[in-house]
Amino acid sequence: MTSISSDTPLNGKAPVHLALRRVAIDTYRENVAYLHRDCAACRAEGFQALAKVEIRVNGRRILASLNLVDDPSIVGCDELGLSEDAFAQLGAEAGVPAAIAQAEPAASIPALHRKIAGERLNRDDFLAIMRDIAEHRYSKIELTAFVVACNQGELDREEVFFLTDAMIRVGRRLDWREHPVVDKHCIGGIPGNRTSMLVVPIVAAHGMLCPKTSSRAITSPAGTADTMEVLANVELPFERLCEMVREERGCLAWGGSSDLSPADDVLIAVERPLSIDSPGQMVASILSKKIAAGSTHLLLDIPIGPTAKVRSMAEAQRLRKLFEFVATRLGLTLDVVITDGRQPIGNGIGPVLEARDVIQVLQNDPAAPIDLRQKALRLAGRMLEFDPDVRGGDGYAIARDILDSGRALKKMRSIIAAQGGKPFDHNHPPLARLSFDVLADCDAVVTGIDNLQLARIARLAGAPKVQGAGVDILRKLGEPVRAGDCLYRVYADFPADLAFARQATERASGVSLGSPEQVPTVFVEF
């Protein structure tokens, strides 16, 4: 997260000093300050609710949105409260003197107004906006206005480049001092699909540097970080993260504390609740994070299917060209693969179930989901071909040998240990205590699996907050079923969650049954 070092307040006024207090509220990527309405500072300075204020402690400064409170148990008249995220940024102890003053308005607001009016912005405009966003100068309303304006009047490809470049410039950028530094990313929308947890140990076992930082789930049943957290700690101090990447040649960590693209982190907090994921913002978000993390080579997975994020080959090709244009301008080597997104990848949806699938593949367990194994090997093979010593077309065989020989499992165990491993038995995973089965009502073939509906059911069951909750798929596309066969099993820890999930399955199970010729086809690379 971005903070500014300074000894002089931005607005030139003498700040008011109050005792710092930690307020245990998670405001998710928004700095929030709390003042008692009757404190002398409020009356003297004319502070208003939701105003932007500047807070300074021991030479570090952040900007925050102000909330006024009437309850002295939250903050007293001689105290300044800070939300969890804001408190952590200052790195100070509770009770130390903190200075608060009115913040200057964001200088980029005129550029924001032009974008709202539908005008095209230049490079300097985007840089000014991203700098103000990273420094928390924008209110939630202004952030929402920017996101919606960029979505309604779709950014042209030059604007996408300007936005991506600006996101990189306002954050930290790593330099690993070696080449190549590889990474992979999927644009999302497919439940399960935990290929990163297989690709990273395969590529790292080969000796290539793969610093994989991933997100937590916000609207999905599990992100890579949520699933890895079943096996190990994912919240690593920045210095420790860099150290272990050099030692292990890879990591599987949460990227939320690395400050690599702070403006993007703030924007995501607005985009996700609105379900806004426009092509331009998607490209800028993904590429800014990868370049800031020091990657020189990126493998990008674009799944397509009837219920995937991208639903046609034409749409996938347009997105591919936009990614390639921006990546080329930024000096990033990019390989885009368009993959099968007709159904979830793997059997489990939810952190524990997905971790089980990953370990089964690494252990070469006969029960391992074949689709997850095959996709991971193909992706890893493409990444290995970034190595100048690997001939084109040989990557898959090398990846398969690393997996089959147990080297990938050994490397994964080493990464898990370096990140503070947790006990996990994939043969007896710690699943949620309640469950019910969704059954086939006729003899037929599985002709469709709705990614969105199964993800929704898994979330209603409690995933990812309840690690053992989710959906375990027992029948995949094209497989025959008899009436009464279990299509999938839903796990939940609480009766209310189980009831919500059951109601959702009764309205729409997410699995279609029919004849073999009704199974949809999709022409993809793999």
Swiss-Prot record:
GO BP term, pick one: pyrimidine nucleoside metabolic process
Catalyzed chemical reaction(s): thymidine + phosphate = 2-deoxy-alpha-D-ribose 1-phosphate + thymine
EC number of the protein: 2.4.2.4
Keyword list, A-Z: Glycosyltransferase, Transferase
Stored SMART domains: PYNP_C
InterPro entries reported in the protein's UniProt record: Glycosyl_Trfase_fam3 (IPR000312), Glycosyl_Trfase_fam3_N_dom (IPR017459), Glycosyl_Trfase_fam3_N_dom_sf (IPR036320), Nuc_phospho_transferase (IPR035902), PYNP-like_C_sf (IPR036566), PYNP_C (IPR013102), Pyrmidine_PPase_CS (IPR017872), Thym_Pase_Put (IPR028579)
UniProt GO MF annotations: 1,4-alpha-oligoglucan phosphorylase activity; thymidine phosphorylase activity
One cellular component term from this protein's GO annotations in UniProt: cytosol
Keyword ATP-binding applies: no
Pfam families xref list: Glycos_trans_3N, Glycos_transf_3, PYNP_C
Top-level EC class: transferase
Domain of life assignment: Bacteria
Record family assignment: Belongs to the thymidine/pyrimidine-nucleoside phosphorylase family. Type 2 subfamily.
Protein name from the UniProt record: Putative thymidine phosphorylase
Organism of provenance: Stutzerimonas stutzeri (strain A1501) (Pseudomonas stutzeri)
